[in-house]
Regions:
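Core nucleotide-handling region used for phosphoryl-transfer chemistry
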Residues: 1-346
Length: 346
């Protein structure tokens, strides 16, 4: 929630508070109350009640974990650029890519724990026996699906392992130490949309899988029913040190492998995007304001690739500085429809 400073002063006058409570705040400070007066709070839809003992803790899967410390890493949280517009400087080289509305996935070929047989344990008394090996891991945004040996991958939120489907398409391109971060878009094997809003699917041009009475199956094909867009690539060495591919390297690697990266909308100096802006006069604020309404990036417009009339989600900005960070700018039109959808319990 963003409140103009003039409106904040009027509110302070209304409740009888001095303006001094905010005059010493630094730019970028986040707060939801002033002197115990609540300004705003996040609206959370109450989830439907479920039967059974809600206090019972979910059983943890048993088995041998594959994970080696500092080898597999989840994706970092993308920061709202409106919270920190000053991070982009006019002379920064930036990448702007389209933000699609799907589900996040990760595929990696990293060092994993190697289960030792009794022969290995005996041999370890006399010589060094490796206890790690390179192996595949795949995950959703927060859950590794094949973390344990001899365990089936979890179906997860959608009731089917869409992440395993995506991983099977990407694993042939993985080399030792490589991790791919991507968005899965389109449809699920069940025929449901990966993402929908107010009853309309974010199909991104993919066809809904249909039951075939001849084969008694529902054919599900990569490139026809669902797609994968890669937005980040890292290399992790045996010591756990991570090398981050630049935005340009991600685009080039995908091109070389015949895979699809996120759509790159702009690459170059930030100042050249809007050369009419004065760098000495509130350049950062004006830059973000221009960006938020730029039709070249489909801002505040319908998705350019979906068959359905659904709002474009927004854009992602990366600064080419070698750091593991990215910034997002969502369309107000998308956020408004998302709020309506959440209110309906979708």
């Amino acid at each position: 929630f963003i409140m103009p400073i003039d409106s904040l002063y009027k509110w302070l006058d209304f409740i009888g508070e001095s303006h001094e409570v905010v005059t010493n705040l630094k730019e970028g400070t986040e707060f939801d109350s002033l002197d115990k007066h609540i300004l705003c709070k996040k609206y959370v839809v109450n989830p439907p009640k479920t039967s059974g003992n809600s206090s019972r803790q979910a059983k943890q899967p048993k088995g041998i974990s594959k994970l080696v410390e500092n080898q597999f890493r989840f994706h970092y949280d993308t920061v709202l650029i409106k919270k920190c517009p000053w991070v982009i400087k006019p002379n920064d080289i930036i990448s702007i890519t389209s933000k699609v509305h799907g589900t996040s996935g990760i595929s990696a070929d990293v060092l994993c724990k190697r289960p030792l047989r009794w022969k290995d344990k005996v041999a370890s008394w006399f010589t060094d026996v490796p206890d790690t090996k390179y192996d595949y891991l795949w995950s959703s945004r927060k859950v590794v699906k094949n973390q344990y040996y001899n365990k089936e991958a979890s179906a997860g939120y959608y009731g089917c392992d869409i992440w395993g489907e995506a991983h099977s398409k990407l694993s042939p391109y993985l080399t030792k130490g490589l991790t791919l971060y991507y968005e899965i878009i389109g449809w699920l094997p069940t025929g449901q949309a990966i993402q929908a809003m107010n009853g309309k699917a974010y199909d991104y041009g993919y066809e809904r899988p249909v039951w075939d009475p001849t084969t008694q199956t529902t054919p599900y094909e990569y490139g026809k029913n669902f797609g994968i867009q890669i937005y980040r690539i890292t290399y992790t060495n045996p010591d756990g040190v991570v090398f981050e591919f630049s935005a340009r390297q991600v685009q080039q690697w995908c091109k070389d492998k015949g895979l699809i990266p996120v759509e790159q909308l702009y690459y170059g100096y930030a100042k050249k995007l809007y050369p009419e802006l004065d760098e000495t006069e509130h350049w950062n604020e004006n830059f973000i304001q221009k960006l938020a309404n730029d039709k070249r990036f489909h801002m505040e417009e319908l998705s350019p690739t979906c068959h359905n009339d659904v709002p474009h989600e927004g854009i992602v900005i990366r600064i080419e500085n070698g750091l593991s960070e990215a910034y997002k700018l969502k369309c107000f039109r998308f956020l408004g429809e998302e709020s309506k959808s959440l209110d309906k319990g979708e």
